[in-house]
Amino acid sequence: MIHFSINKNLFLQALNTTKRAISSKNAIPILSTVKIDVTNEGITLIGSNGQISIENFISQKNEDAGLLITSLGSILLEASFFINVVSSLPDVTLDFKEIEQNQIVLTSGKSEITLKGKDSEQYPRIQEISASTPLILETKLLKKIINETAFAASTQESRPILTGVHFVLSQHKELKTVATDSHRLSQKKLTLEKNSDDFDVVIPSRSLREFSAVFTDDIETVEIFFANNQILFRSENISFYTRLLEGNYPDTDRLIPTDFNTTITFNVVNLRQSMERARLLSSATQNGTVKLEIKDGVVSAHVHSPEVGKVNEEIDTDQVTGEDLTISFNPTYLIDSLKALNSEKVTISFISAVRPFTLVPADTDEDFMQLITPVRTN
């Protein structure tokens, strides 16, 4: 029968992290619970939605936790309800005691709340990933890669493989990550400091975004383990499992052009602000596009909406080379791409009005390239 006391705020923080893997509307009702596992070493909180699973460990040795364990065991509690109850408790310290099979009493200050739980044996087992040699990355670096690519993945389930980000390690240290929804593409390449085993996996972009939320910047490094259809991201106290997407990712290398007819370098902030103004009106037009005109070295953006009005704006540039061009595209794609850049300047290169154009950072030597497909207009 479980019995422990703990700092309420730290416990609540750990519960909220674990809850990111828990869906209250799951087809499997037991997955709307959080599993609380108490051992001599500490407390493990477990949550899963079938796609991702999070194990969050609070160590007996963690001084901030003020953890005092009197007796061991495990129990399932309805996650959202339990977290709401814990957050409402008045005192800094929380006492958690199982009084009879799967029934607990929470005591804090003068408040005492009794809750019914469920037998932890009902909870599905998380498939263990056998201990192999992990790939070790800086957490900040992995989160940066995710920020630069995951936004370009598809949100449509019609082609499930495109809802993921393709991670490929070749020659033991050359990492390439790509995401595309077939209208836009984002690709980041880098050379790792240490050699690792090659891999080729597609990780759901939704799982990667959750990873970024769960692994805060104070976690310096993350260990990455691969198994048949799963990947595990692990730090000292958090294990984050996600299923991989099955199938072959399309060959995106052939989509990337190398020869261009027009090249422009912009200030990222200026261009983004221009596009955000243009989008205010383009969202009211039938095709939602903005027209970019390059003529005699001058670049301007145009939107015309019969219902709302029009935008004509000359955009400052640092450099314009090549042929004149008029091209239409979805401004949201360009805004998203600019948000993913960590540079002050961007170079955009065009072939023609109907061929995809590329964006690369102009003032860093990062191997980071984005591609946007234009929209054909009359």
From Swiss-Prot:
Pfam families: DNA_pol3_beta, DNA_pol3_beta_2, DNA_pol3_beta_3. The keyword Protein transport does not apply. SMART domains: POL3Bc. The keyword Transport does not apply. It comes from the Bacteria. CDD domains: beta_clamp. Disulfide bonds: none annotated. This is Beta sliding clamp. GO terms for cellular component: cytoplasm; DNA polymerase III complex. Keywords: Cytoplasm, DNA replication, DNA-binding, DNA-directed DNA polymerase, Nucleotidyltransferase, Transferase. Forms a ring-shaped head-to-tail homodimer around DNA which binds and tethers DNA polymerases and other proteins to the DNA. The DNA replisome complex has a single clamp-loading complex (3 tau and 1 each of delta, delta', psi and chi subunits) which binds 3 Pol III cores (1 core on the leading strand and 2 on the lagging strand) each with a beta sliding clamp dimer. Additional proteins in the replisome are other copies of gamma, psi and chi, Ssb, DNA helicase and RNA primase. It comes from Streptococcus pneumoniae serotype 4 (strain ATCC BAA-334 / TIGR4). Confers DNA tethering and processivity to DNA polymerases and other proteins. Acts as a clamp, forming a ring around DNA (a reaction catalyzed by the clamp-loading complex) which diffuses in an ATP-independent manner freely and bidirectionally along dsDNA. Initially characterized for its ability to contact the catalytic subunit of DNA polymerase III (Pol III), a complex, multichain enzyme responsible for most of the replicative synthesis in bacteria; Pol III exhibits 3'-5' exonuclease proofreading activity.
